[in-house]
A protein has these predicted regions:
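Conserved, compact domain cores that house catalytic/ligand-binding motifs in diverse enzymes
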Residues: 170-207, 269-333
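Bacterial N-terminal signal peptides
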Residues: 8-19
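A cross-family detector of function-defining hotspots
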Residues: 286, 294, 298-333, 337-383, ...
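Positively charged n-region of N-terminal signal peptides that target proteins for export
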Residues: 1-6
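Short, surface-exposed beta-strand/beta-hairpin micro-motifs centered on an aromatic residue
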Residues: 224-229
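Conserved structural position at the C-terminal beta-strand
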Residues: 132, 240-241
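Short beta-strand elements
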Residues: 137-163, 244-274
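Intrinsically disordered, low-complexity terminal regions enriched in Ser/Thr/Pro/Gly
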Residues: 21-213, 220-222
């Protein structure tokens, strides 16, 4: 997360090291702070795809940098020990650290549905509870993943046969899907507007729900049954070409960079628009040395280098969190939730009721508490699209927070 900190200011940050101290009690994922990336020790990913009528394929990805590797003696290799659960099924996953190992450690298992749910009786399964425990750190992360039913969707795969574990892919990547021989599909796409959400006190409607993807190619599945397409910017869909009614079986969002990372100078400048004046922003965009202009902005806010480094770490750390948790048809930092998360930080409390999220800052019920309500809204290209309930009363609170940023009075989450 901190690579861009040293890149902007020229300050060096050490890598985040995994601790070696065993905790006495099991550390669980922090459901009270679901959008605080740093409050979770492990960030595994899992994809579940039916393998047949009575089995399911589960694909795990675990970041090796987040696991604790130990060895029994100076001559022994370093190994990690993970315990995984898929529903009721439990197994141990041991990984030996070798030179040149990739960042992500992968594990694939095919399980009978009765192993996952002992009471299974042939019914359709829509989601599966998963968990991974680092036995050497005594840390556990549990989550639920949807089952990508082949009747309703065609999972997207990378060239190595591993499924896409998000709905985002870098523009220019080639994705694959498996379909019956002779079936015909349309690949369509639409670029997404790059506008920012209006402040909490201003009402300007988002237009991403008016996108109309255009057909870019027609794909006829051959004897291998494997088909491919190149990811284009914005919304990419695969639709049944022979269906009387539009039947979309795959949706992928094409981004110029890995969607959760903030490494590009243009993105760094664009995402700080929430706390800049219009003139400051236009000056950075038009500057012949945009990096120097961005440096100058942060140093001017903080008044001294070390403070600027901390503010950069906090701000762009929140941008990355917004991308991880809120990205859909829009990049996470461009969404209503992303905007509030970046400027205000991690809420003191989050309440989720039905199709709403209530973000509470400060002591709930007190006169100084600030509450934002986000409503889940129907969107043709995003099933997790939330809109902020805006109100002119937020003007004072918003201006105060922006002023705090500009005066260097922001504390890390």
């Amino acid at each position: 997360m901190n690579q861009w900190v040293s890149w902007i200011i020229g300050c060096c940050f050490g890598a985040i090291l995994v601790g070696c101290t065993m905790q006495s009690n099991m550390a669980l994922s922090h459901s009270q702070r679901p959008y605080d990336f740093e409050s979770h020790t492990l960030h595994p990913r899992g994809v579940a795809i039916p393998g047949s009528t009575d089995s399911v394929d589960v694909f795990f990805d675990v970041n090796r940098e987040e696991c604790l590797y130990l060895r029994e003696s100076p001559q022994s290799p370093f190994v990690s020990q993970l315990e995984c659960t898929v529903g009721a099924h439990r197994f141990t996953w041991v990984d030996t650290l070798v030179s040149g190992a990739s960042r992500w450690n992968r594990k694939y298992v095919r399980l009978d549905w009765h192993e996952v749910f002992p009471e299974w009786a042939g019914q359709l399964v829509e989601e599966i509870p998963l968990s991974i425990t680092d036995l050497q750190r005594n840390v556990r992360h549990a989550w639920t993943t949807d089952v990508l039913t082949k009747e309703a969707s065609l999972p997207a795969y990378h060239s190595d046969g591993w499924p896409l574990n998000t709905r985002h892919a870098v523009v220019g990547d080639t994705l694959y899907f498996y379909s019956p021989t002779g079936s015909t599909w349309h690949h369509a796409s639409a670029a997404v507007p790059t506008t920012l959400p209006s402040p909490p006190f201003s009402h300007v409607k988002d237009r991403s729900d008016t996108l109309e993807p255009l057909i870019r190619s027609t794909i006829v599945s051959g004897n291998s049954r494997w088909n491919s397409y190149i990811v284009l910017p914005g919304v990419n869909i695969i639709a049944d070409a022979n269906s009387a009614e539009p039947r979309i079986v795959q949706r992928v969002y094409g981004t110029q960079f890995p969607f959760d990372q903030v490494r590009d100078l243009r993105v760094m400048i664009q995402s700080c628009r929430y706390i800049t004046s219009r003139k400051e922003f236009e000056r950075m965009v038009a500057s012949k040395d945009s990096k120097a202009a961005l440096d100058a902005f942060w140093l001017n806010c903080a008044n001294e280098k070390d403070r600027a480094t901390q503010m950069i770490s906090t701000y762009y750390g929140r941008v990355e969190e917004a991308n991880r948790y809120f990205s859909g048809v829009l990049e996470g930092w461009r969404t209503d939730r992303g905007m509030v998360h970046i400027v205000f930080g991690v809420p003191t409390k989050i309440r989720k009721t039905g199709g709403s999220e209530w973000w509470i800052y400060g002591e709930e019920g007190s006169a100084n508490a600030v509450t934002f309500r986000f409503l889940r809204t129907q969107h043709p290209w995003d099933d997790q699209f939330f809109r902020l309930s805006r109100n002119i009363l937020y003007r004072t609170t918003w201006d105060r927070m922006v002023t705090n940023w500009r005066n260097g009075r922001i504390q890390p989450d």
